[in-house]
A protein has these predicted regions:
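Carbohydrate-binding surfaces of carbohydrate-active enzymes
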Residues: 1-58, 62-277
């Protein structure tokens, strides 16, 4: 898995990124993160952060009722095996905002495609709740899904915000957009004061029994403790001095390590070095 995820970066994301740079355009998108796929193969890239390398924005997708008020636990859904509401509420947006903070290429830009396939009962009230949820977790670019040029009705992942005048809430969409744009514009130049790094446990998941990242993320979030999710790759490159480790421009004082049956030797060495300082 370690080599496979490196090869995915080298032969897919880097190739696309190089083309975009050569042609003067930004490169952005999202992986498939659903229900643990962010650290698995199949329909995932095997490692969220490696799958996002070289992109100018960190990206995620919130779709089909993944984030719903009160549904922050595992529950039945349209997807096989149900929906892991704990991951969607406490880890999904933090993956993107953490990558945006720690990868210098991204310059703090964290994007989310949102609102698709929630159905026609979603509405602007729910959309504002979802947008607020994402913004307080560090998302500062929103891609609304979707304005659909096809004739109404089209059954591809509604709601659609205009539908040639059939959506009665479209007249109010401007107020929602103005609000989100204003808040996100304020946030884009901010600095997130995280002192705690939460280890991304992909390598431990590949090797044996492990604790999913959303478990400690939930505890930290509900305790209102700011944190970023940090990876083995970032930790190996970190500057470690005076009891702190620095990744990009963020200085961390604490590293939270979820349970893992096995751990890569080089990761163990970095943690031991940090402990000794």
């Amino acid at each position: 898995m370690d080599r496979i995820t490196e090869l995915y970066h080298e032969n897919f994301t880097k190739v696309l990124a190089d083309w975009c740079k050569d042609h003067g355009v930004w490169y952005l998108g999202h992986n498939i993160e659903d229900n643990g796929a962010h650290a698995r193969l199949g329909y995932g890239t095997g490692h969220y952060f490696r799958g996002q390398q070289e992109m100018d924005f960190a990206g995620i997708d919130v779709i089909g009722g993944q984030i719903v008020p009160g549904m922050n636990y595992h529950h039945d859904a349209f997807s096989t095996g149900g929906s892991n509401g704990e991951f969607y509420h406490y880890a999904l947006a933090k993956l993107a905002s953490s990558a945006a903070h720690l990868d210098p290429v991204k310059k703090g830009r964290a994007m989310c495609e949102a609102f698709g396939a929630y159905g026609w009962n979603e509405g602007l009230k729910t959309m504002k709740w979802i947008a607020d949820h994402l913004m307080v977790r560090g998302i500062n670019y929103l891609v609304p899904h979707a304005f659909n040029p096809k004739s109404f009705p089209d059954f591809d992942c509604p709601p659609h915000f205009y539908v040639h005048g059939h959506n009665p809430q479209f007249r109010y969409f401007k107020y929602f957009s103005d609000y989100v744009n204003r808040v996100m514009d304020i946030m884009k130049d901010g600095h997130y004061p995280a002192k705690i790094g939460l280890l991304y446990p992909a390598e431990m998941e590949w090797a044996g029994d492990y604790m999913p990242v959303e478990k400690p993320a939930r505890v930290l979030t509900q305790s209102q403790i700011p944190f970023d999710i940090v990876t083995r790759d970032y930790l190996k490159q970190a500057e470690i001095t005076d009891g702190k480790y620095k990744i990009n421009q963020t200085e961390f004082e604490v590293l939270v390590v979820p349970y893992g049956e096995y751990m890569p030797e080089d990761l163990k060495e970095v943690i031991e070095k940090f402990c000794k300082t």
